[in-house]
Swiss-Prot record:
SUPFAM superfamilies: Cytochrome f subunit of the cytochrome b6f complex, transmembrane anchor, Cytochrome f, large domain, Rudiment single hybrid motif. The 4 large subunits of the cytochrome b6-f complex are cytochrome b6, subunit IV (17 kDa polypeptide, petD), cytochrome f and the Rieske protein, while the 4 small subunits are PetG, PetL, PetM and PetN. The complex functions as a dimer. The lineage of its organism: Eukaryota, Viridiplantae, Streptophyta, Embryophyta, Tracheophyta. Its cofactor is heme. GO terms for cellular component: chloroplast thylakoid membrane. This is Cytochrome f. It comes from Lotus japonicus (Lotus corniculatus var. japonicus). Heme binds at residues 36, 56, 59-60.
């Protein structure tokens, strides 16, 4: 009986320990996951809205350029490069989550036509692998292999990202035709201003939540500020919390208005989107074009030879 109770007690303790460890893991792991742009895709079934806007712009509010380079035409079942460039000043530093300054990271989303997908590793040439570096690409959804995401990765090393793409073959995929297709791209540099849950990051401007007089500013030990504002209308005290990172622009005793910036804008990054076009070319059409061009060349050569032969005949008749 005592042995059975001992085993029961041990079983309960093991179960309780596992539960505690699982809860601790979830608590610690969740903020880290939410910090990565790739996890924001859980909120959107498709990264490109009906208006053409890519949803990454909901978190990265500043508008910045992005460029994409793809071949004009590709043949079926071939691997080609889609090069995405995310330019920015390599000298600038961004505000990190802890308020310190650090290098910018970059990320990108590539929306390909249906049927196009990430090339298998065994189909990628050594030249393309060298350009790819150590990047790891993922599908936006398991069912959407034509939408690829990457990042965040160090911007100083990967401001130019090479995607290895495999073109579809209409002979094996009846949903694909030999047509001109659009390709859409979105690229960001630096941290966003809004988290996926809608809360503001410290990479943001913080404004006054009321108008009045700044009564007190407390600098916190771990960084950031606690600003007490005496409301001008009823005299009540309103406390605005500023996280570590943004620089304070106001001082005690200063009169401020509603929505007046209390801090500078620390954001040095931003998001941009662009597009390109690619033609999935029919090999038979290419062969037909080559045959047509070759026939024209041979016809021209034949005419030149005939002309010279005619001139020789005329010259011989004149001499006769």
């Amino acid at each position: 009986m005592q042995t059975r109770n001992a085993f029961s007690y041990i079983k309960e303790e093991i179960t309780r320990s596992i539960s505690v460890l699982l809860v601790i893991y979830i608590i610690i792991r969740a903020p880290i996951s939410n910090a990565y742009p790739i996890f924001a895709q859980q909120g959107y079934e498709n990264p490109r809205e009906a208006t053409g806007r890519i949803v990454c712009a909901n978190c990265h509010l500043a508008n910045k350029p992005v460029d994409i380079e793809v071949p004009q035409t590709v043949l079926p079942d071939t691997v080609f490069e889609a090069v995405v460039r995310i330019p920015y000043d390599m000298q600038v530093k961004q505000v990190l989550a802890n308020g310190k300054r650090g290098a910018l990271n970059v990320g990108a989303v590539l929306i390909l036509p249906e049927g196009f997908e990430l090339a298998p590793t065994d189909r990628i040439s050594p030249e393309i692998k060298e350009k790819m570096g150590n990047l790891s690409f993922q599908s936006y959804r398991p069912t959407k292999k034509n939408i690829l995401v990457v990042g965040p990765v160090p911007g100083q090393k990967y401001s130019e990202i090479t995607f290895p793409i495999l073109s579809p073959d209409p002979a094996t995929n009846r949903d694909v035709n030999f047509l001109k297709y659009p390709i859409y791209v979105g690229g960001n540099r630096g941290r966003g201003q809004i988290y996926p849950d809608g809360s503001k990051s410290n990479n943001n401007v913080y404004n006054a939540t009321t108008s009045g007089i700044i009564n007190k500013i407390i600098r916190k030990d771990k960084g950031g500020y606690e600003i007490t504002i005496v409301d001008a209308s009823d005299g009540r005290e309103v406390i605005d919390i500023i996280p570590p990172g943004p620089e304070l622009l106001v001082s005690e005793g200063e009169s401020i208005k509603l929505d007046q910036p209390l801090t500078s804008n620390p954001n040095v990054g931003g998001f941009g989107q662009g597009d390109a076009e690619i033609v999935l070319q029919d090999p038979l059409r290419v062969q037909g074009l080559l045959f047509f061009l070759a026939s024209i060349i041979f016809a021209q050569i034949f005419l030149v030879l005939k002309k010279k032969q005619f001139e020789k005949v005329q010259l011989s008749e004149m001499n006769f």
